[in-house]
Amino acid sequence: MTITASNTLEFKWTSPRSSRSSFRTTTDAEQKISIDMSNTYCDQVLGPLYSYMMVLGLNHTHSSARNTMFKWPLTIYNYLTLAILTAATIRRISQIKQKSATNEEKDAAFHVLNPTFVLTLCHALLMFSGLAAGFLLLKLQKQREKMYHVLDQGLGRNRNEEHDSHHFKLNKLFISISFSFAAALSFVQIATKMRYLDLPDTPDLINRKIYFVILEGYVIFIASSCISLVAILFFQLCRILQFSIGQLIEEMVPKEKEECPLPEQSLQQIHDVQIHYQEISNAKLYIEQNFSFSLFYTYGCCIPLTCLLGYIAFRNGIQADMAETFSVAIWLTNTMLALMLFSIPAFMIAEEGDKLLTASFKMYHETLCEERDLLVLSQMSFLSFQMHATKLTLTAGNFFMMNRKIMISLFSAIFTYFLILVQFDAEKERAGECNNQSRVLIVQPPV
């Protein structure tokens, strides 16, 4: 991955052997100091993510710019961005119970939750999630050697130019989508503060001066981008892992194979499969260690966000114009997009893991030739036991397994909580009408 003079990203593929051989020439002491990521799997395939992080002030330590004269200015920019995001998050959380002076009439029309509270809570959740995502990205940068070993030294040996180029283009597409949604959320907030949109307002972060309003929009842009970057990184790591599982299945059950190979050939095949499976298991463990809590937090955060935004859209849907409806739709779409980026890849890994178990049974059956060596059968039995004991399934904070059943439970919970909010609102409205009727003094005419 290089940046040309026209500021466009260009993909240049290098074979896995070149990157692995160059890595072996370095000493252990040099590994601890720095690793040249210029021709590695991480730097090339995930290059668009790192470039976008540099622009946002979340510069990845793999970047070649950190070895130039811009090292210290970029470092200051990075920490300044995190400091602004942290201060804005604390400020917004402290404003959750505050009321906006411009929304008294709109808030009074809502019997359960007023729009100011809902949108302030949504902003607080967005900023806090973005702050947590920013620190997670910082943690992953410190563990760049671990990612290097997992992707380049392990799964990278099964890559090919077409697959890498596809991942590279997909990353560019995801970055464009992330930028578009982050810019849209920022624009909606600035336009609301400037009274161009008649949306429920939130308490001012500082005041309504133009530069503070722009700062508030910038914070929302950074927070949304951080969340998207973590989701995209998780999605791509899972895609790489899924591709490697597919390669392992083809290695276990090749299309063209001898009817009854020699015991030495079978032992070598089993040995190669064991090494490849261990590399995949290490990659899965790396992903789970770094993203398990993020999966759990995403489900815990997206469910209330979707319910609250859906309630506001339902209550304000008749009176709202097209711009207001579109703004709420942007919030909902952005929330569901982050949820899908965290969910679908985890489901795909679980399904590929089930295919791997099926392939292990088929591979075991193909070893049952006449006069089969007992050592081959024992090694194959151990491999099958290893695959069944360490299933390739991700967990969300070790609370539940990530599979398609969770998605059904998710939508069921969102729909249930949404109906509860609507029911409470209808009961409050009915109770308010009864109170108004009881206060009317009925004077009967004299007989």
UniProtKB/Swiss-Prot annotation:
GO terms for biological process: detection of stimulus; sensory perception of taste. GO terms for molecular function: signaling receptor activity. Keywords: Membrane, Receptor, Transmembrane, Transmembrane helix. Residues 1-69, 138-171, 233-292, 350-405 are extracellular. It comes from Caenorhabditis elegans. This is Gustatory receptor family protein 3. Expressed in I2 pharyngeal neurons. Its main location: membrane. Residues 91-116, 193-211, 314-328, 427-447 are cytoplasmic. The keyword Transmembrane helix applies. The keyword Nucleus does not apply. The chain crosses the membrane at residues 70-90, 117-137, 172-192, 212-232, 293-313, 329-349, 406-426. Chemoreceptor involved in light-induced avoidance behavior. Probably acts as a molecular sensor in I2 pharyngeal neurons, required for the inhibition of feeding in response to light and hydrogen peroxide. Involved in circadian rhythms, probably by acting as a light sensor. In contrast to lite-1, does not act as a photoreceptor. GO terms for cellular component: axon; dendrite; membrane; neuronal cell body; nucleus. It is a multi-pass membrane protein. It is found in: Membrane. It holds the Pfam family 7tm_7. InterPro entries: 7TM_chemorcpt (IPR013604). Belongs to the insect chemoreceptor superfamily. Gustatory receptor (GR) family.
